[in-house]
């Protein structure tokens, strides 16, 4: 079974490039300090890597 990751948006997307905004939205994060739980898949890990400066990640 894949591990679960708890992803929290900790920095704003204001002033960020459109691709980073789209990645944050694709992760399901809409507001600051919003948290989602996702399965650890290569796609999700790539998205986290792209916006790692905006989010914090913990194992759920």
Curated annotation (Swiss-Prot):
Stored Pfam families: Ribosomal_L30
Entry-linked Gene3D superfamilies: Ribosomal protein L30, ferredoxin-like fold domain
Gene Ontology biological-process annotations: translation
Recorded GO MF terms: structural constituent of ribosome
One cellular component term from this protein's GO annotations in UniProt: cytosolic large ribosomal subunit
Keywords assigned by UniProt, alphabetized: Ribonucleoprotein, Ribosomal protein
NCBIfam families, per the entry: rpmD_bact
UniProt similarity note: Belongs to the universal ribosomal protein uL30 family.
Self-association and partners: Part of the 50S ribosomal subunit.
Protein name: Large ribosomal subunit protein uL30
Native source species: Bacillus cytotoxicus (strain DSM 22905 / CIP 110041 / 391-98 / NVH 391-98)
Name of the gene: rpmD
């Amino acid at each position: 079974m894949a591990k679960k990751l708890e992803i929290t948006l900790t920095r704003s997307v204001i002033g960020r490039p459109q691709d980073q905004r789209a990645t944050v939205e694709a992760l399901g994060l809409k507001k600051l300090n919003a948290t989602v739980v996702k399965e650890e898949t290569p796609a999700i890990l790539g998205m986290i890597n792209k916006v790692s400066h905006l989010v914090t990640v913990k194992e759920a």
